[in-house]
């Protein structure tokens, strides 16, 4: 499957927003209407926050800036958006894990709950190869192969 060069961050932000919204939904005390407002506002806030810190050609660049973190203190972006739907800080702390790390990077969104939890991938897409040789001719030929190449010896008899 080939991908065109993609510079937008829509799938990654949608994955992050969907995950955070589902965490709020599981407790059942936030109405669907308020969750929709939260989702839209969070999508807008993250898009604005990340716009000068999104580097598809170097996905790890800016990763710390894009990281959403709850470590007994609420991430400021989540706090701001939650206040728009009337959720207070204490309510947020009841609804969300006390320790959550959410990495929103080009081509991958992953999270960890707790300091020692496993990292789980929410969204993953293979990065686009550039014309600068991320895929060499040899690698391109090997891509379709499921088994290692066989070695052949050619002999010439006289």
UniProtKB/Swiss-Prot annotation:
Keywords: Phosphoprotein, Transcription, Transcription regulation
GO biological processes: anterior/posterior pattern specification; associative learning; cellular response to phorbol 13-acetate 12-myristate; central nervous system neuron development; dentate gyrus development; DNA damage response; negative regulation of apoptotic process; negative regulation of cell population proliferation
Cystines in this chain: none
PTM remark: Phosphorylated at Ser-147 by MAPK1/ERK2 and MAPK3/ERK1, and at Ser-149 by MAPK14, leading to PIN1-binding and mitochondrial depolarization.
Phosphoserine: residues bearing it: 147, 149
Tissue-by-tissue expression: In brain at embryonic day 13.5, placenta, amnion, and spleen, which are proliferating and/or differentiating.
Highest taxon of source: Eukaryota
GO cellular component, one term: nucleus
Gene3D superfamilies cross-referenced by the UniProt entry: Anti-proliferative protein, N-terminal domain
SUPFAM superfamilies registered for this protein in UniProt: BTG domain-like (SSF160696)
InterPro entries tied to this protein: Anti_prolifrtn, BTG, BTG-like_sf
One MF term in the entry's GO annotations: transcription corepressor activity
Stated induction or repression of this protein's expression: By nerve growth factor. At lower levels by epidermal growth factor and membrane depolarization. At much lower levels by fibroblast growth factor and interleukin 6.
Regions annotated as coiled coil: none
Name of one Pfam family that matches: BTG
Assembly mode: Interacts with PRKCABP. Interacts with CNOT7 and CNOT8; indicative for an association with the CCR4-NOT complex. Interacts with PIN1, inducing mitochondrial depolarization.
Family: Belongs to the BTG family.
Biological role stated in the UniProt entry: Anti-proliferative protein; the function is mediated by association with deadenylase subunits of the CCR4-NOT complex. Activates mRNA deadenylation in a CNOT6 and CNOT7-dependent manner. In vitro can inhibit deadenylase activity of CNOT7 and CNOT8. Involved in cell cycle regulation. Could be involved in the growth arrest and differentiation of the neuronal precursors. Modulates transcription regulation mediated by ESR1. Involved in mitochondrial depolarization and neurite outgrowth.
Protein name (database record): Protein BTG2
Organism the protein comes from: Rattus norvegicus (Rat)
Phylogenetic placement of the source organism: Eukaryota, Metazoa, Chordata, Craniata, Vertebrata
Gene symbol of the encoding locus: Btg2
């Amino acid at each position: 499957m080939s991908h065109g060069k993609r510079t937008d961050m829509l799938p990654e932000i949608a994955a992050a927003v969907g995950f955070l919204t589902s965490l709020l939904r599981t407790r059942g005390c936030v109405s669907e209407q308020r969750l929709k407002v939260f989702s839209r506002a969070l999508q807008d806030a993250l898009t604005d926050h990340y716009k000068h810190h999104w580097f598809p050609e170097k996905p790890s660049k800016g990763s710390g800036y894009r990281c959403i973190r709850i470590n007994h203190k609420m991430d400021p972006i989540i706090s701001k958006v939650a206040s728009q739907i009337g959720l207070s800080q204490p309510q947020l702390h009841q609804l969300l894990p006390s320790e959550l790390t959410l990495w929103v990077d080009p081509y991958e969104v992953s999270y960890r709950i707790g300091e020692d939890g496993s990292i789980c991938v929410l969204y993953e897409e293979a990065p686009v190869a550039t014309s600068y040789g991320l895929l060499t001719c040899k690698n391109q030929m090997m891509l379709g192969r499921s088994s290692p190449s066989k070695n052949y010896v050619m002999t010439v008899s006289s």
